[in-house]
Design a protein with these regions (language model features):
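Short amphipathic recognition helices of helix-turn-helix/homeodomain-type DNA-binding modules
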Residues: 3-21, 74-119
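Hydrophobic protein-protein interaction segments
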Residues: 114-131, 138-286
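A short, Lys/Arg-rich alpha-helix, primarily the initiator
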Residues: 1-48
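Short amphipathic alpha-helical surface patches that mediate protein-protein
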Residues: 68, 97-101, 135
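Core residues of bacterial helix-turn-helix
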Residues: 45, 55-56, 86, 140
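Recognition helix of helix-turn-helix/homeodomain-like DNA-binding domains
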Residues: 38-44, 49-50, 56-73
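Short polybasic/polar patches that bind polyanions
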Residues: 22, 26, 54, 84, ...
């Protein structure tokens, strides 16, 4: 059964659409898309609306109405040419599609399948299951040892909150990159459910922090398959001796969970695996 957006939900989605498209226009120069820069000084950075319309093969009026979120311009047919014009990624194109659609997508609950339960029993890896708002809902002993999740309050189980706290203690470019990725994942989920109370509560609680606010206002959108790199673990670990270990981290989507995924982190070398094993054993003994 189709569930149409309420007027409030529609207005929230269109506001996100307008902001996102403006940010993407501002991020592109004419030379980036094969257009002449011209001799006139530009009052605003990036592409102008007529230039996007030209690249998309639609009228300037139609693109303007689309960017402004006007009902009569809300068509899935123009998303593809506009996405090409703005050089959108697949995740960004899907985000725009979610904001434009008239129906709300059903949001299934996050269920822990038996195979995932077995994975959570593996203490050679750090395994954390997060919901679509990046709040940890299940984790294994290795994750408890590394991230102190067993002792964390409800707020501190959220990855955006943990990023902000870690960055305030020790800012670095690598950590900022991870924060941008998490925020982009969160943005992607918010496009499906822009009025969600839990999501908006999380954002409101973090807006007072300048770093989060600056990254949030960039309006970047990311997908899990973009996280394919080795990073120093971005969060303050259980033991400071683990801070210098390098990790491989991958996020895998959980089917039919509307954005929930499992994060699997493993040390990149034997020394790291040995140290993680030691602190996990110590954590298990303390919890017994």
């Amino acid at each position: 059964m189709k569930i149409l957006r309420s007027e409030e939900s529609k207005a929230a989605a269109r506001k996100l659409l307008t902001d996102f498209l403006k940010k993407r226009r501002a991020a592109l120069k004419p030379a980036d898309v094969g257009l002449p820069s011209g001799s006139r000084l530009r009052r605003t950075p990036g592409l102008r609306r007529p230039e996007v319309a030209q690249l998309a093969g639609i009228s300037t009026e139609w693109y303007t109405l689309f960017e402004m979120g006007r009902d009569r311009a809300m068509s899935q047919r123009v998303i593809e040419p506009i996405s090409r014009a703005l050089r959108l990624t697949e995740a960004e194109r899907e985000y725009v599609s979610d904001l434009v659609r008239a129906e709300l997508r059903p949001q299934p609950t996050l269920e822990i399948a038996p195979a995932l339960c077995r994975l959570l029993e593996d203490d050679e890896k750090v395994v954390v299951v997060v919901d679509r708002w990046l709040t940890a809902v299940r984790w294994n002993a290795a994750a408890a040892a590394l991230l102190s999740l067993d002792a964390a309050d409800e707020r501190s189980t959220n990855l955006l909150w943990r990023f902000q706290q870690a960055y305030a203690l020790k800012p670095c470019p690598e950590l900022e990159s991870q924060g941008r990725f998490f925020i982009g994942i969160f943005r992607r989920a918010l496009g499906r459910d822009p009025l969600n109370r839990e999501a908006n509560r999380i954002v409101a609680s973090l807006r007072s922090y300048p770093t989060f606010r600056e990254l949030w206002e960039r309006h970047e959108v990311h997908s899990l398959d973009e996280e394919s790199r080795v990073l120093r673990h971005p969060f303050r670990p259980f033991n400071s001796a683990l801070d210098e270990i390098r990790y491989f981290t991958i996020g895998l989507p959980i089917p039919a969970s509307a954005g929930g995924h499992v994060r699997i982190t493993v040390p990149a070398d034997d020394a790291g695996r040995s140290l993680l094993r030691q602190v996990t054993s110590a954590q298990t003994l303390l919890s017994a």
